[in-house]
Amino acid sequence: MRLIIVSGRSGSGKSTALDVLEDNGYYCIDNLPAGLLPQLAENALINTELQQPKVAVSIDARNLPSHLTRFPELLEEARTRHIQCDVLYLDADEDTLLKRFSETRRRHPLTNANRSLAEAIRVESELLGPIADLADLKIDTTSLNLYQLRDSIKLRLLNQPEPGTAFLVESFGFKRGMPVDADLVFDVRCLPNPYWKPELREHSGLEQPVIDYLAAQPDVEEMFQDISTYLLKWLPRFAASNRAYVTIAIGCTGGHHRSVYITERLGQLLQQSLKNVQVRHRDL
């Protein structure tokens, strides 16, 4: 049995995540009291009417604070029943959450006459801290629209042909912020920039003119070799430590040229020696 626990601050995309999981065959429960987590795991295994191979639940700040504080031991108790438990934590920056509540005109569950929306969001962060700390996978939804979030969840949680650590090699542009879910970040902004070549500006690192230009630059090749050597040596150690997910982020200024080129090459290289290697270009 596989159990996916979805959590995160209000407005970060938990409902969308549950919808995706339900569409992919998961039995979903919204706003499960955290204290019932071990009981759910046991019932799903032994009760033939409830038995499901794939279950997903959301746990949010409407829980009793004491249950959220006890989340680490509740999760461990569920895992002792030999269930594969994955914790997905969704989040976005505070300005984005404020904007989403303003646009939808929904009420935050922790607001009241004495607590503003901004204060409620900060209180929610504290309450959900024990879950965030134990997340196997964190997804920053700040820059994702609905369809991108659905694709990201399917890519990271559901597209795993082999058991073991799932590796994501992701390009991004620093001007839109670093991915908060990145485990390793490599800055390639020091490399020659095709953006300053008028004939290359409108092309991406996936297109042959940019590929040919960057492949001819000695610094680019040296950077690629250095990053490759590091990853080939140390990523197997991450896998050996039972990490469920590892995100390697490659950043340039805009996320269109240098980081895309390096990311594509790294993905192709790592797929030759590691299982579950996926490639994503955040800002294309």
Swiss-Prot record:
Ligand binding (GTP): 60-63
A Pfam family the protein falls into: RapZ-like_N
Cited function: Displays ATPase and GTPase activities.
Disulphide bridges: none
Record has ATP-binding as a keyword: yes
InterPro entries: P-loop_NTPase, RapZ-like, RapZ-like_N, RapZ_C
NCBIfam families per record: PRK05416.1
Homology family: Belongs to the RapZ-like family.
The keyword Ribosomal protein appears for this protein: no
GO molecular function, one term: ATP binding
Keywords for the protein's UniProt record, in alphabetical order: ATP-binding, GTP-binding, Nucleotide-binding
Positions contributing to ATP binding: 8-15
Domain of life of the organism encoding this protein: Bacteria
UniProt protein name: Nucleotide-binding protein PSEEN1090
Organism annotation: Pseudomonas entomophila (strain L48)
Gene3D superfamilies: P-loop containing nucleotide triphosphate hydrolases (3.40.50.300)
Lineage: Bacteria, Pseudomonadati, Pseudomonadota, Gammaproteobacteria, Pseudomonadales
